[in-house]
Amino acid sequence: MAIRKKSNKNPPLLSHEFLLQNHADIVSCLAMLFLLGLMFEVTAKGAIIFVALQYNVTRPATEEQATESASLYHYGIKDLATVLFYMLVAIIIHAIIQEYVLDKINRRMHFSKTKHSKFNESGQLSAFYLFACVWGTFILISENYISDPTILWRAYPHNLMTFQTKFFYISQLAYWLHAFPELYFQKTKKEDIPRQLVYIGLYLFHIAGAYLLNLNHLGLVLLVLHYFVEFLFHISRLFYFSDEKYQKGFSLWAVLFVLGRLLTLILSVLTVGFGLARAENQKLDFSTGNFNVLAVRIAVLASICITQAFMMWKFINFQLRRWREHSAFQAPPVKRKPAVTKGRSSRKGTENGVNGTVTSNGADSPRNRKEKSS
């Protein structure tokens, strides 16, 4: 992300610079149109599809919970409209954090262009990872994921979700979709775009896969685990920009990164390879959302393993690069010995002149003049 220079002149309407400077205001107006649509009966039915979660199912109260009935949700095609609206919300929040927090810090710290771009990236991602990690942990605790790990595969397919779980997934999809237009809004360098596209695409692929295959329990646990490790990395990088001697956070992150990859593989194999493989119902059924067949299980495990291997490969390259930079910084400079020339002509040239500059020769030195006078 390049530094945005503010100019006193107003750019032409709907020009490239106009869209970059005012994209948050334009998106805010679009979001307000959906909210205003809720106020009128004619447009309320269409607007509510974008704003509220769809596919609500009311489960009647059981004997254990006779006081109230449970409202659960499943997914459908209308979720695309909801994701679109909250993608607009994510763009607005992104602009607020950028203008009122990160830009003010950048003006105080006077970062270079490279550090400015990385600082903005880590600032935005650390805020998102912290929020998503806290929210996901709250869901895990409230729905007894921690006290009963078998909930990851028991009673599959998990085609019904609580409001918090579905809203969490909708928000995740909306956030990572908003990252595509942000590449344009933040003037991302061309050489950084392929890396960003791979990064965003992997998130969308795995989040959408867990959501559509009704593996939302496993996906939620893995996301919280991954987000915590990523939050530690980006918050450490923010501290590093203010003090380049800061290395403790990176050391802790390196350990937790490896442990996170290991835990991800263990939980995935335990859930998909053992838990779902021993389930009684192993027939493909789109109506009930049951995808517990051998081909799907192999595809899920393969995608997770390949992604973890790719992340470890990037991690090892990153650590090797840091180690080389640290070694080069710590290595003492090599002292060059002056070359000793042989022969009378070289000695005479050295005495009488160096690089064309005339110097005093041996006969004119104070010591030799003293010997002659004696």
Curated annotation (Swiss-Prot):
Main subcellular location of this protein, as a coarse class: endoplasmic reticulum
Entry keyword set: Endoplasmic reticulum, Glycoprotein, Membrane, Phosphoprotein, Protein transport, Translocation, Transmembrane, Transmembrane helix, Transport
Sequence ranges on the Cytoplasmic membrane side: 1-29, 98-121, 181-192, 239-251, 319-374
Domain TLC: 117-326
Compositional bias per record (Basic residues), positions renumbered to this chain: 334-347
Stretch list, region Disordered: 333-374
GO cellular component: endoplasmic reticulum membrane
UniProt GO BP: cotranslational protein targeting to membrane; protein insertion into ER membrane; response to unfolded protein; SRP-dependent cotranslational protein targeting to membrane, translocation
InterPro entries assigned: TLC-dom, Translocation_assoc_membrane
In-chain residues carrying the UniProt-annotated modification Phosphoserine: 365
Lumenal side: 51-76, 143-159, 214-217, 273-297
Topological category with respect to the lipid bilayer: Multi-pass membrane protein
Membrane-crossing residue ranges in chain numbering: 30-50, 77-97, 122-142, 160-180, 193-213, 218-238, 252-272, 298-318
Superkingdom of source: Eukaryota
Processing and modification events after translation: N-glycosylated.
Biased composition regions of type Polar residues, renumbered to the chain: 352-363
Localization per record: Endoplasmic reticulum membrane
Pfam families according to UniProt: TRAM_LAG1_CLN8 (PF03798)
Primary role: Involved in the translocation of nascent protein chains into or through the endoplasmic reticulum (ER) membrane by facilitating the proper chain positioning at the SEC61 channel. Regulates the exposure of nascent secretory protein chain to the cytosol during translocation into the ER. May affect the phospholipid bilayer in the vicinity of the lateral gate of the SEC61 channel, thereby facilitating ER protein transport. Intimately associates with transmembrane (TM) domain of nascent membrane proteins during the entire integration process into the ER membrane.
PANTHER family: TRANSLOCATING CHAIN-ASSOCIATED MEMBRANE PROTEIN 1, TRANSLOCATION ASSOCIATED MEMBRANE PROTEIN
Quaternary structure, from the entry: Interacts with SEC61B. May interact with Derlin-1/DERL1.
Protein name in UniProt: Translocating chain-associated membrane protein 1
Naturally occurring in which organism (per UniProt): Mus musculus (Mouse)
Lineage per the UniProt record: Eukaryota, Metazoa, Chordata, Craniata, Vertebrata
Gene name for this UniProt entry: Tram1
